[in-house]
Amino acid sequence: SLTVAWVYLSDDPAENIELVPEPQIVATQEESGSTVVMDLPEQQEEQEVPINAPAEIDEPPVQSTPQISSTSIPETQVNQSDLSLAETQTPLSQVPNDNLVMQGDNGLLPVMGPDGLIAWKEYARPFQETDTAPRISILITDVGLNTKSSTAAIDTLPGQIDLGFSAYGRNLQNWMDKSRAKGHEAFLMIPTEPINYPDNDPGPHTLIAEATERDNLLRLNWLLSQVTGYVGVVNHMGSKFTASEEALTPVLTDLQSRGLMLIDSRSTRFSMAARTARRLNMPRAINDRYIDNVITSEEIQRQLAELENTATTFGAALGLARATPLTINEIARWSMSLSE
């Protein structure tokens, strides 16, 4: 059987291993708990690439429309009563924990608390470490940008599905509070420079590879201040920024000092994000597959099946998808099948 859940990190970062399946380049996209992340074998140092990401990626702008096939099946709404949501949407603790925030220039900033209190553990969804089933983690990105899609993601999906919040959304704390009330862990999307910036612009306060350390940290502080209650961050776009260890190091050092974890969306095979996080002993996870490059029921289900295969083979797998109505419905249907 398979379980939708985050696999928790060991308390000792040296024991953490980053899960990297054998790369199979078949599709394209530049985007977007506590998870077991496994140290890369030395011979795989140049193989950090999502299964369905190409060697080079044309990045859509932040408001681009995902590819929709002409054969797309009309979406149908999932009957929430069929999802046993009450069993999965156990409320998480209210945020913020006053010991984990400080007042910054633009709002509350995450900080480490006393006695080892850290955000990626405190805000995490509870986890049964004795469950040895293969684990699938899914992160739905772009939450907070669209009211209908954000509501559907929060209310329709099981609590084990994590949500990635855009720093550009309105009323983000309200969305965060609603999502935690339904059991969802949250990540904050951090816009990072793509190779063809500014033609493709992730948005204001994008982290830039050639900017000064001070400028990037000021931008990062603005982004982190837009909402509180997330366990970590995920890079949005970033094929240029994430390929620069020099640019990444001060940013990840700051994030690690705040008790946050990292998801490397791996929008490019040249991403150094997870590798740099490992060097800094930062909790981290690596995207294995983009689920909804092509938004059709058939293709989304095919990608989910491939994610299952990865989890069965390696013990855990992580996939990213966007908060579109069809994607949300298909992931909800798929999650039902795992419990059957």
Kindly give the residue locations of the regions a language model identified:
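Hydrophobic membrane-insertion alpha-helices, especially the h-region
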Residues: 1-5
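Juxtamembrane proline-rich low-complexity "stalk" or linker regions positioned immediately after a signal peptide
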Residues: 6-111
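Extracytoplasmic/secreted cell-surface and envelope-processing proteins
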Residues: 18-20, 147-150, 172-174, 196-200, ...
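Glycine-rich phosphate-binding "P-loop"
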Residues: 108-112, 133-140, 236, 291-295
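Active-site beta->alpha N-cap acidic-glycine motif
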Residues: 115-201
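Conserved, mostly hydrophobic/aromatic
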Residues: 141, 233, 318
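Catalytic domains of cell-wall/extracellular-matrix polysaccharide-remodeling enzymes
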Residues: 210-301, 312, 322-339
